[in-house]
Amino acid sequence: MSRVTREELIKVIQEQSEMIAVLHGIIENLSKTVEESNQIIINLNKTIDELTQRVKELTEQLGMNSKNSSKPPSTDINKPAPKSLKKPSGKKPGGQPGHTGNHFNISLEPDETIFHMPSGCLSCPNHDICLSRACVGEIRNVVDAVVNVKLTAHQSLVVDCPLTGITHKGMFPDDIKAKMQYGDNFQAFVVALNTVGAVSVNRTHEIISGIFGVPLSTGTIVNMVNRCADRLTGIMEIIRQKVIESEVGHFDETGTNVGGKNHWVHGASNPLFTHLSISDKRGFAGMEAGKVLPYFTNVAVHDCWPAYWKYLLIIHALCNAHILRELVATEERHPEQKWATEFMKLLLDMKEAKELAIASGKNELDEEQLLEFELRYDALIKRAYEENPLPLESETKKRGRKKKGKTLALIERLDKHKASVCLFIYNFEVPFSNNLSERDIRMIKTKTKVSGCFRSILGAENYLKIMSYVGSSKKHGKSAYEAIKQAVSGNPEFFFT
């Protein structure tokens, strides 16, 4: 065996060193690749979590409808099967025994009477004799509308006085200002059609021109509405004060469009008065602009919009109809969680207990009942927290509040505002829901849906003046047309007398 020379050994060592260096480079590259792969996996997991959360949110949005949220029924895509929280009454449909009943009946003398003889008598020679002896066997009435346009000519008479020789001219009444003008009935009908009827200006023009045959431009319609609103400035201040003085006030807001931009109609009302205002802000600034809440100090029923809680002097009561809808949504999202179903039952039991107490002539619930409801409330909140724990702190800190989800947000709201949720069983003047205010602003949704938007803020303000006035009049038992006619005639305070 030949002996390895020193030169050969050095060469082998150099080759091995070079190979080791190459392997070190490969290892470093592989380590770098592994680190990059690990980071990619971390980023992918993060993306998957975010997408999973987004899918969950979108699924929840698709599941929202008019039955489990505040969305209007018109937005329902796949309309859900009817589901009511009301308990069966056990009564048969229709009128109940003992009720007075209503049917189509008008106590007016007929303008025209048509007699109908038997068909066989028409060609009989004794027809006239039989007709004179006939008696009425049955009466059927047809109620129809006949449109008549009444033109009243006002003529100013000129008289030469025989005593003084001076010529005198008769004066027109103050409200007769032009050679041709529209009367109060006509103006009231036009304004009512455009505002209360939610008919657009163009369609109002078509309807009026077609029915009455009277020329009427769209500009004249707008002027009629504006003049009517101008006469309501004083009554709006009275309505505002009446709402401020309420023992229980109802407050709500809804969106609309003015000149292509989002605005918010703020409603403030009580059982006798309705006050509507508009602002480009939904929150605190919009409420301040309405000039009702800043001066209100009694019980305010609302939907828990955060801006309401900035008013520290009022007593807050929450709309339980909103809460029931949110509980329905929770039940649909998490059918395995039974606390939402039991919480709905608790609220409805509280409502029923109050109704039974009122029917019995009581003005408060028994202490035992109140204690039972309190204990059930607290137990359900505790159970809800156990099934929906707070989110854990993440390793990577993020700015802002941790996202909790709708279910946990609802639980925390029910926990934090327990007194406001239950106020209706402690104060019988406080209603279970805020339906009164929701009814008062419902026409705004209809108007927006029909007309699309208001062209100007002035047009929106004038519309809300008229709707506030009409809403208040209807609560006093007056019809919308009667109210608008009185306003056009210059007597908007008529329903106070």
Regions found by a protein language model. Name each.
Residues 1-180, 222, 251:
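Short, flexible loop/hinge motifs at secondary-structure junctions
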Residues 2, 28, 158-160, 166-497:
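Catalytic center-proximal scaffold of phosphoryl-transfer enzymes
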